[in-house]
Amino acid sequence: MIFDEDSSSVAQESGYMGVGSPYSSDVGRISMSDHWNKLTKPSSIKVVNHGNALNKADLIIEPLESGFALTLGNALRRVMMSSLRGFAVYGVEIENVLHEFTSISGVREDVTDILLNISMIRLKLSGMDNKVLSLKVKGPCEVRSGMIADTPDCTILNKDLLICTLDQDVDFNIKMYVNSGKGYVPAVKRKSINKFGLSDVPVNFIATNALYSPIKKASFRVESSRIGQFTDYDRLIMSVETDHSILPDEAVALAARILQDQFQQFINFDETDEPHQKVDTKDVLPYDSNLLRKVDELELSVRSYNCLKNDNITYIGDLVQKTESDMLRTPNFGRKSLNEINELLASMNLHLGMKIANWPPESIESLSKQYSEE
């Protein structure tokens, strides 16, 4: 498969064309770090669970640069589905059974059906990569995965899964071999390379299909987001369902870490090579520069700005120490103005109700001026 796209189409799509754009001859004057530092980064990652099910959740990530939600969402989804590691049964020993193409006296299901059911067992090991589980049952009864006793290092996650049905007074004894892996490994592939992880393969060992992925479902959708008056930003909503071995937000975090590790190999420059990135410690000040900005620098509606002005709120540092209740008690300040301010603060990784020690600082005017000149 070949994917090709020229810079002119990217420029048109992004709105960068003509003199002074990143795609013109002025590119040599752009600081290297500007390529990533001047992009909008998500200021909010919200996890919304589906009712009481901790294994199902939507992750809402915003704001993102236009087009980034599709790029990141597709990459995260594919990595989650294919590359996260989990545990699965990869082989069994069933007493008095030499191969899968047979039946067991007194057992309703044949061996192929039993193996299919066993491959659907979801479990989690702690402190180890492989283990042998034993199950001994006497009929008549339904044999379920919950009959495999939990141990300190092994937890069965779907205890109601039916393994087989014993219709008669028969013994059903089975050993299940568990290990860690990723993706889906069919039994035929494991047999073809003799990869069982065993020093001595038992004569009645039967390989099973192994589904290691802890992800049951993963999808995403893209919506519009806004910062202040600008609406050309993306909101990414990742919908993730796991097998209970990890939480949805953990799955997304692991996928992001895998991508980070892979992309690191493409970076062929040293970020510390840029002279302008050297920091003189005598110029380091104790406050986030955004806190020292004046509220009249924000792109607020006239109503919102006048409300702040009338309440003697001059700096963003003054604003963030107010609670939502404080703001709503301000004359003429309503829910619409509150949402506007919350969105602007979120874009700076700030929020209402913050506690800032020793505020306001002495010489706040000079500090504000110093930050504005940086």
UniProtKB/Swiss-Prot annotation:
Catalytic activity of the protein: RNA(n) + a ribonucleoside 5'-triphosphate = RNA(n+1) + diphosphate
Annotated InterPro entries: DNA-dir_RNA_pol_insert, DNA-dir_RNA_pol_RpoA/D/Rpb3, DNA-dir_RpoA, RBP11-like, RNAP_asu_C, RNApol_insert_sf
Quaternary state and interactors: Homodimer. The RNAP catalytic core consists of 2 alpha, 1 beta, 1 beta' and 1 omega subunit. When a sigma factor is associated with the core the holoenzyme is formed, which can initiate transcription.
Alpha C-terminal domain (alpha-CTD): annotated span: 282-374
Protein name, entry field: DNA-directed RNA polymerase subunit alpha
A GO MF term: DNA-directed RNA polymerase activity
This protein's GO CC annotations: cytoplasm; DNA-directed RNA polymerase complex
Positions of the UniProt region annotated as Alpha N-terminal domain (alpha-NTD): 1-270
Enzyme Commission identifier(s): 2.7.7.6
Superkingdom per UniProt: Bacteria
Pfam families registered for this protein in UniProt: RNA_pol_A_bac (PF01000), RNA_pol_A_CTD (PF03118), RNA_pol_L (PF01193)
Biological-process GO terms, alphabetical: DNA-templated transcription
